């Protein structure tokens, strides 16, 4: 957990082991993470926590996405629904969040491991269906700036609308 911060970071390891789709934009290698409330990590293992296990599920789904579909990759243009693509459902039934947008990491800069390999880090941020439309119009970086909690998971934050 970052010192002096009110959040913990859960990050994938191994997503960048193999390249995703060939691209001249340098999108072949990435890792994804989520900034979650500190107390979620203090309660033990996220996998054993029914209320917050979705964090691990969506990180794993995102990590595999760029490898299982031919020509696929992840970057800040990608929105990933929770559940099935045609039938997204909330992470937690008490809230409206049904997808995550990918944002460039503010915490970890891109890592050049050798001449040909540059690993980019992205933060997954939960969004609602209304916010999904905003992301499609304005982009994830603009929407992240509009969120009161930035790129941290905060189910109590104000929901953005198109107005």
Q: Which residue stretches match the model-derived regions?
A:
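Acidic, proline/glycine-rich low-complexity IDRs
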Residues: 1-20, 27, 33-163
